[in-house]
Amino acid sequence: MCGAHYVAIALLVVAGSLAAAEFDQNEIQQTSDDDVMASVNSTYELLQSRILRERREPKDNLLSAGDEERTPSSPSSFLKELKVSDSIMDAANVIRTEGGASAIDAALKNLNQLNRKRRQRIAPTSKNVAGHEVGTSSDTDKSLVSVENETPFVLAKRRRTKRSAAMMTNAARSAKQHDYRLAPTESSTIPAKAPDDQLNKQPISQKALQLDKNEHVDESLWREELMTVDEVLHLFEEFDKPAHPTAVNLQEPNAIETTSKKLNHLRRNKRKRKHIASTPKNVGQLVRAPPLSDKSPVLVAKGIPFVLAIRLKKNHPTAIMKNAAKFVTQHDYRLTPSGPSMINAATPNSQLKFHLLGQKALHLDKNEHAGDLNEESHTVEHIFHLRERNDKLAQTTAVNQQSVLKNWEAEIANGPLLLSRDRPDKMVKEIHAAFLETFNLPFHQYP
């Protein structure tokens, strides 16, 4: 009996080794005590079938000597459950969890890379809006320019500048308000007949330029070009416009009353020190609009050359500019505005065309400072008094009208005005006397 037990134990060991060799080592995992017992039972069943197969062989005398129906006892009777400590199980669980987390991270990275490559391969689509194709980008990585604080720095980075300029800031503000991207080429506008009732939208670059011209910070960005002769003449015409719309048709029945109301209105606005709005009123004739407030009228001869030099981008006024200023101030007239802007005075003593009341006010401003004017009420008689005063001045300075003859004997005796290097000659004196008698003007004043 002892020998039979020894033989059975030896066969059990051999069968266990053979069964272990047949199992796949990659699929065996010891997770709990139940799995261990399940593996032991499967080993027992395999061993039992192997023993029965060996007992059918005729050469096995040892097994045939005993009872053929006798089988070894169940291994659960002499095998005990393996006790695994909790620390070992916790360590195994941690190792398994870390491995799963690393695998998940790697899978997410691969998925993101695949998504980015797939977005880059997708071609941009186009939409038909009211018969026009409008390109739309499918790249979702590029977000809309809708943040005012970050967009200027992005634009500055693309232009390789250190700080954001005023144009970039205004472009960011326009993008935040309208919330749309730059339209592609050949489809930069959306017609007003679109189904979604969208108005015509210009590109952000054009809107930024328009905003920057109106609200620019650095005025040196917008430089004025050199002016031509026609532009200079137009500039004089702008300066020669009356300061206030005061053209009145004398044939109107209520012209005097309307004029007094206008003057009282101007006097009240002057006391309040407010800007007079350029609201034209139709009183028989069209009223010319006043010039812009930033363009001060050229009233002083010394200031005209410097104004022209600044407008023509010159450091100092030239001789032509000085002569033009001298010509304007000596003859005391301004460019006559075109159209029905003159008042024909139907008086028997004078047939001259009088200037506008605004030009008369400018003439007074040449002689008296605006702050020193008397603020008493301007009546109609005062207006006609100013007109008569201007008539007298116009008669003495009119070029196209012959003045009253004057005795030039003293001028003839003194002779013409000569330079220090010139010497008076008899012929020069004769020419001087002839000019005085013929043109009724001194020789040195003849144009």
Swiss-Prot record:
A motif (RxLR-dEER) lies at residues 50-70. One of its GO terms (cellular component) is extracellular region. The keyword Transcription regulation does not apply. Residues 57-78, 122-143, 171-198 are annotated as: Disordered. The keyword Transcription regulation does not apply. It is found in: Secreted; Host nucleus; Host cytoplasm. Keywords: Glycoprotein, Host cytoplasm, Host nucleus, Secreted, Signal, Virulence. It comes from the Eukaryota. Residues 1-19 form the signal peptide. Its main location: secreted. Glycans are attached at N41. The RxLR-dEER motif acts to carry the protein into the host cell cytoplasm through binding to cell surface phosphatidylinositol-3-phosphate. Belongs to the RxLR effector family. Secreted effector that dos not suppress the host cell death induced by cell death-inducing proteins. This is Secreted RxLR effector protein 115. The gene is RXLR115.
